[in-house]
């Protein structure tokens, strides 16, 4: 059993339907499988919805290894647009991560990369979400 490292992952998000809306999702967790967690986030579509004043972050990923309650300690938005009755679907613009075995995080150890969702991935996700919510989100 490996010793877990403290990891911080920052995901810069852009609203698919409003390019002016940008948010930064910060996830702090203890895991010795940072590369798996990073890969999972890189393949993820992130949906946010606000219910009763609480912002829920829903991560859907095609990876076999997903962030789960066992390793995610804290997940919060440092900037978050006001959500009304619905939610927002985000694409990941940039992801940075940092991991230290001694528990101290240093911005100098960040690794950055960017991605863009394909149209087919987005359509598939919208169909899943439409089914989940009970109404059609596709334009």
From Swiss-Prot:
A motif (DLNP) lies at residues 136-139. The keyword Repressor does not apply. Monomer. Homomultimer. Heteromultimer with NS2. Interacts with the matrix protein M. Interacts with host ELOC and CUL2; this interaction allows NS1 to form an active E3 ligase with ELOC and CUL2. Interacts with host IRF3; this interaction leads to the disrupted association of IRF3 with CREBBP and thus reduced binding of IRF3 to the IFN-beta promoter. Interacts with host MAVS; this interaction prevents MAVS binding to RIGI and inhibits signaling pathway leading to interferon production. Interacts with host MAP1B/microtubule-associated protein 1B. It comes from the Viruses. N-terminus is important for IKBKE/IKK-epsilon reduction. The DNLP motif has IFN suppressive functions like binding to host MAP1B. This is Non-structural protein 1. Changing residue 125 to A: Decreased viral RNA replication and loss of inhibition of IFN-beta production. Pfam families: Pneumo_NS1. Keywords: Host cytoplasm, Host mitochondrion, Host nucleus, Host-virus interaction, Inhibition of host adaptive immune response by virus, Inhibition of host innate immune response by virus, Inhibition of host interferon signaling pathway by virus, Inhibition of host IRF3 by virus, Inhibition of host IRF7 by virus, Inhibition of host MAVS by virus, Inhibition of host RIG-I by virus, Inhibition of host RLR pathway by virus, Inhibition of host STAT2 by virus, Inhibition of host TBK1 by virus, Inhibition of host TLR pathway by virus, Interferon antiviral system evasion, Modulation of host cell apoptosis by virus, Viral immunoevasion. GO terms for cellular component: host cell mitochondrion; host cell nucleus. GO terms for biological process: symbiont-mediated perturbation of host apoptosis; symbiont-mediated suppression of host adaptive immune response; symbiont-mediated suppression of host cytoplasmic pattern recognition receptor signaling pathway via inhibition of IRF3 activity; symbiont-mediated suppression of host cytoplasmic pattern recognition receptor signaling pathway via inhibition of IRF7 activity; symbiont-mediated suppression of host cytoplasmic pattern recognition receptor signaling pathway via inhibition of MAVS activity; symbiont-mediated suppression of host cytoplasmic pattern recognition receptor signaling pathway via inhibition of RIG-I activity; symbiont-mediated suppression of host cytoplasmic pattern recognition receptor signaling pathway via inhibition of TBK1 activity; symbiont-mediated suppression of host JAK-STAT cascade via inhibition of STAT2 activity.
